[in-house]
C-alpha cells in the first residue's frame, strides 16, 4: 500500500503535510510521516493502516485523513 505525499485534512479539521511512508526498523510496519500545518509543528508518525482507515464521526463513516492537494 502506498500514500501520495501532500496536504491532508483530518476528519476533525486540522491540516497536515504528509512527507511520505517509512518502514519500522524492528517489525517493518509501514508508518506515515507527517507534520501539522498549524501550531508548533514537529514530525509525527502513524501506522499507514490507521491513517487510511474509515472512522465514525457524528454518526457517519468518513476517512480519517482526506487528500487535499499536492505540496510542490
Question: At which residue positions do the language-model features occur?
Answer:
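Mixed-charge, low-complexity intrinsically disordered regions
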Residues: 1-72
Amino acid at each position: 500500500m502506498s500514500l501520495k505525499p501532500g496536504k491532508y485534512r483530518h476528519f476533525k479539521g486540522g491540516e497536515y503535510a504528509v512527507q511520505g511512508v517509512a518502514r519500522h526498523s524492528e517489525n517493518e510496519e509501514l508508518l506515515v510521516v507527517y507534520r501539522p500545518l498549524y501550531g508548533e509543528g514537529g514530525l509525527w508518525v502513524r501506522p499507514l493502516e490507521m491513517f487510511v482507515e474509515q472512522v465514525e464521526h457524528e454518526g457517519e463513516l468518513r476517512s480519517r485523513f482526506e487528500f487535499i492537494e499536492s505540496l510542490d
